[in-house]
Curated annotation (Swiss-Prot):
Recorded superkingdom: Eukaryota
Homology family: Belongs to the chloroplast-specific ribosomal protein cS23 family.
Binding partners and assembly: Part of the 30S ribosomal subunit.
Keywords: Chloroplast, Plastid, Ribonucleoprotein, Ribosomal protein, Transit peptide
UniProt GO molecular function: structural constituent of ribosome
Organism: Arabidopsis thaliana (Mouse-ear cress)
Entry protein name: Small ribosomal subunit protein cS23y
GO CC terms of this entry: chloroplast; plastid; ribonucleoprotein complex; ribosome
């Protein structure tokens, strides 16, 4: 039996201009909800209304990209009357982000006479930790040095080693075919 958790967060905001008096009700309401299910994606729904109008609801699948709001917005923690909880009971809402696993990434420095290749351990919420210095091609055999380093790390899977070495090969080949020029 599968268990689904439904978390959502709500935010209201009001627009204000010098000639406009703020009302006690928000003019727009944004609700972000996610279902913790492997195949689902977070969803965003936005309601906008004027006093005396029925809210128009818009939704989109991917809320990852937001435009910056105009500078004349005032944020409010009030909920519209239809969504406010009864007195004495407060609804608590939590937004849960899925956990990302740490991963090993390939970094490179593209120069005119050399290309540098290095490995970093990327830890979500913390940053990156360098696993190797930059190995430069064609001064030394950067691919062989990278392979030796990857083999010395038993916690990196064989499949991921092959993937990283293939990426390094592709980058070195691209650098060689372009003669070091990006243009």
């Amino acid at each position: 039996m599968a268990v689904q958790a439904n978390q959502s967060a709500s935010f209201g905001f009001r627009t204000a201009s010098p000639s406009q008096k703020l009302s006690s009700k928000p003019i727009a309401h944004i609700s972000l909800s996610t279902k913790l299910k492997p195949s689902s994606r977070p969803s965003l729904s936005c309601s906008t209304w004027n006093q005396g109008q029925i809210p128009a609801r818009h939704s989109c699948i991917n809320p990852g990209i937001f435009a910056y709001p105009p500078s004349n917005l005032t944020f409010s923690h009030e909920l519209p009357e239809s969504e406010s909880p009864p007195l004495g009971k407060k609804k608590m809402r939590v937004l849960v982000k899925p956990l990302e696993k740490p991963k090993v990434v390939l970094k490179f420095v593209w120069m005119q006479k050399d290309i540098g290749v290095a490995l970093d351990h990327m830890i979500p919420g913390f940053g990156t930790i360098p696993l190797s210095p930059y190995y430069f091609w064609p001064r030394k055999d950067a691919w062989e040095e990278l392979k030796t380093l990857l083999e010395s790390k038993p916690w990196i899977s064989e499949l991921h080693r092959v993937f990283l070495l293939n990426q390094a090969t592709d980058i070195i080949n691209l650098w060689q075919s372009s003669g070091g020029d990006l243009s």
